């Protein structure tokens, strides 16, 4: 069972890193305050990443191009808090065996999100703090 959970965590972490690499984000260029609190596990963050980053295909003449579009381009980062809170509340209620409470995760993510410039920055910051030795 432990091996399965360890493999699942690695797979989730790999997916987050892949999303961030697709967006061509560079973690060395970002400078964020180190906030105290409980960091969200990657299994909580991953589904929200997929809601935020969507794949849109555009057809230009005879050429087909794939672009990654950010849902939040026209919104302030504060507007992102509502869907994030909804997602974490639903995810937290399904995490019966977790030692982290959804309220603690939500509080920490809210702090991190409101102190960064945008959602991409928030996701990047969280990925750095979840697995700093890998990224």
Swiss-Prot record:
Entry's localization field: Cytoplasm; Nucleus
Primary localisation category: cytoplasm
Domain of life: Eukaryota
Tissue specificity comment: Expressed in colon, prostate, small intestine, testis and spleen, with lower expression in thymus, ovary, and peripheral blood leukocytes. Up-regulated expression in prostate, breast, and bladder cancer, but not in lung and colon cancer.
Keyword Cytoplasm annotated: yes
Record-level GO cellular component terms: centriolar satellite; cytosol; nucleoplasm
Claim: Nucleus is one of the keywords in the record: yes
Keywords attached to this entry: Cytoplasm, Nucleus
Protein name, entry field: Prostate and breast cancer overexpressed gene 1 protein
Provenance organism: Homo sapiens (Human)
Gene: PBOV1
């Amino acid at each position: 069972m432990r091996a399965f959970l360890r493999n699942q965590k690695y797979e989730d972490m790999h997916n987050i890193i892949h999303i961030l690499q697709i967006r061509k984000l560079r973690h060395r260029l970002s400078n964020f305050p180190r906030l105290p609190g409980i960091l969200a596990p990657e299994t909580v963050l991953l589904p929200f990443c997929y809601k935020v980053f969507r794949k849109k295909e555009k057809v230009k003449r005879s050429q087909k191009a794939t672009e990654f579009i950010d849902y939040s381009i026209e919104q302030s980062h504060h507007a992102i808090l509502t869907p994030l809170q909804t997602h974490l509340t639903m995810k937290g209620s399904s995490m019966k065996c977790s030692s982290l409470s959804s309220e603690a995760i939500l509080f920490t993510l809210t702090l991190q999100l409101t102190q960064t410039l945008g959602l991409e920055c928030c996701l990047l910051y969280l990925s750095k703090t979840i697995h700093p030795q890998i990224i």
